[in-house]
Amino acid sequence: THPGIYGSSILGEADQRIQIILLDTRYFRDDLDRNTLTDQEKKDVGKVGWYQPTTDTSRTLLGEPQWVWLKTQLRKPAKVRIIVSSIQTISWEKGMECWGNMPHQRTRLFKLIADTKAQGVVLISGDVHFAEISKTDEGPYPLYDITSSGLAQKPHPSWPKAINQYRLPGCLYVGENFGLITIDWATKTLCLQACDVQGQPQFTQNVAISALKVK
């Protein structure tokens, strides 16, 4: 046992091995910097939240013990790795809780994926009360963050209008939803979707597993 709530699991064998990594982004987290924008100023720049990126690189999101643990996990063999974060990893401009409030920690995560040569990483997140997919080329290969939320709570009307330069075209859904990742081992493809309460996909993004490798 250890402080915080984080862990990992391995599913499948050999060429169909999946690793699921659950991160704790709250227990060890240092305080966030709050912005001082008025509601109108937020609207003008596309922000909806209360926070802003810090310049204090001594602050931590995961805590050093969890970082050490994560490095060990990413070195384990797996074809697909699903990293679960309660807050968005890629998108950072909204002013909401996200990895981008500590830019040095966000950068550290991307660098750790590269340094450990961890292939097949896909990020999943929630918290924002709508669904979207963000993509960045800041990692060793294209990184995708599929965000889904919530199952039983409608979004605030302004939140889906928040800025996100990383959002893939067509990959935004406003309404109760859940995320779905389907792995097709025959075609070696990941299918990332957000589904409505009837289970109908509202957007789909296919990703070749072969594209998620450190060169």
Model-predicted regions and their roles:
Residues 1-215:
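Metal-dependent phosphoester/phosphodiester hydrolase catalytic core
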